[in-house]
From Swiss-Prot:
GO molecular function (one): DNA binding
Lineage of producing organism: Bacteria, Pseudomonadati, Pseudomonadota, Alphaproteobacteria, Hyphomicrobiales
Pfam families named among the record's database cross-references: HrcA, HrcA_DNA-bdg
Protein name: Heat-inducible transcription repressor HrcA
Organism: Bartonella quintana (strain Toulouse) (Rochalimaea quintana)
One biological process term in Gene Ontology: negative regulation of DNA-templated transcription
InterPro entries reported in the protein's UniProt record: GAF-like_dom_sf, HrcA, HrcA_C, WH-like_DNA-bd_sf, WH_DNA-bd_sf, WHTH_HrcA_DNA-bd, WHTH_transcript_rep_HrcA_IDD
Family label: Belongs to the HrcA family.
Function: Negative regulator of class I heat shock genes (grpE-dnaK-dnaJ and groELS operons). Prevents heat-shock induction of these operons.
Segments traversing the membrane: none
Keywords noted in UniProt: Repressor, Stress response, Transcription, Transcription regulation
Length: 356
């Protein structure tokens, strides 16, 4: 997509051309249909003949901002046209107080969930309900801070390692015990870990325990030391610190805009692509490239190249302002961007606050 030449020429669009273009896009965002010169003449503040409007539309089409979906039809914005509209015309102000209060109440209610994952599922559903699109959350597997770990002796040479986060999530792993480990040594290892992991993320706790183990080898007996080193490492397989999972709610909302079988196929491609680990990691990285909300229209991002969809997404952060996930709305390219952008931004801020 060669955007640069278009950008250069757009700087010289006169007020009349901008006004006609803006009305074409707004009509498309409202009903998804092309608009013709006769209808435009009734919408414009200026009194212009249909012939004059057609001449301007021809110039806009030459610039790649609008196109005719079929012969003798009106005009609709291209992907480049939508991008220009979002960048040059859209005013994404604050949400109305009533909507802010509604979102805040729903997110806080969801915050009472028993686990972080359930809370994020609820956040995804809230975005879907508010936008009438699909709500999306990308979540790092271990974004929570740790509360404690415990070793529970099982039969034979095995114990159950139980890791609990301050957000209420519980993870269990089986650990194989060295021969001769006593109950007292299990307790010693548990106490040592709990003295140093509380309030830290998993990756921070691992670094701290590794540092302490190298310094305190003489302070712990051999078997207790082995348990300490093994404890948090149980959660290190398959890059667990960076494992990302996808939560989507409201996929059926996207079907309301499907007008042909090929549209359905594009949506299938979208969700197939999103659910690959590489794509999710890429999308999470993109949200960290700049502050605030990111807008991806159509094929601007390769994840959406086949889908004809747009994504409005914002990161949510931990207490150290590190990006630990992202949430947003997927919908057709004719999303109500002016409403969706502040909605996603405010929801991301609330989620960040509740996860700290």
């Amino acid at each position: 997509m060669k955007q640069k030449p278009i950008d250069d020429e757009l700087k010289y669009l006169d007020e009349r051309s901008r006004d006609i273009f803006r009305h074409i896009v707004e009509a498309y965002l409202n009903d998804g249909e092309p608009v013709g010169s006769r209808n435009l003449s009734r919408l414009l503040r200026q009194t212009l003949s249909p012939a004059t409007i057609r001449n301007v539309m021809s110039d806009l089409e030459h610039l790649g901002l609008i196109y005719a979906p079929h012969v003798s039809a009106g005009r609709m914005p291209t992907q480049s046209g939508l991008r220009f509209f979002v960048d040059a015309f859209m005013e994404a102000g604050d949400l109305p107080n009533e909507e802010r209060e509604s979102i805040e109440a729903q997110v806080k209610e969801a915050g009472h969930a028993q686990s972080v994952e359930h809370f994020l599922v609820q956040a995804s559903q809230i975005l879907s309900d508010l936008s009438r699109g699909a709500g999306l959350v990308l979540a790092s597997k271990y974004e929570g801070t740790l509360k404690h770990i415990e070793f529970v002796r099982l039969d034979g040479q095995q114990a159950l390692a139980v890791l609990v986060t301050q957000q209420g999530e519980v993870e269990n792993r089986i650990v194989h015990l060295p021969k001769g480990v006593t109950h007292a040594q299990l307790t010693e290892a548990t106490n040592f870990l709990n003295a140093h992991i509380q309030g830290r993320t998993l990756s921070e706790a691992k670094e701290e325990i590794a540092r302490l183990c190298s310094e305190t080898r003489a302070a712990l007996d051999h078997l207790s030391h082995h348990l300490v080193e093994t404890g948090l490492a149980l959660w290190g397989g398959e890059d667990a610190d960076h494992k990302i999972h996808l939560i989507v709610r409201g996929r059926s909302n996207l079907l309301e805009d499907v007008k042909a079988e090929e549209d359905l196929e594009r949506l299938r491609h979208l969700f197939d692509d999103l659910e690959t680990r590489e794509s999710m990691a890429q999308l999470l990285d993109l949200t960290d490239e700049g502050p605030g909300v990111r807008i991806f229209i159509g094929s601007e991002n390769k994840l959406f190249s086949l889908s004809g969809s747009s994504l409005v997404v914002a990161p949510y952060r931990d207490s150290q302002q590190r990006v630990i996930g992202a949430l947003g709305v997927i919908g057709p390219t004719r999303l109500n961007y002016a409403r969706i952008v502040p909605m996603v931004n405010y929801t991301a801020q609330l989620v960040s606050q509740l996860l700290r």
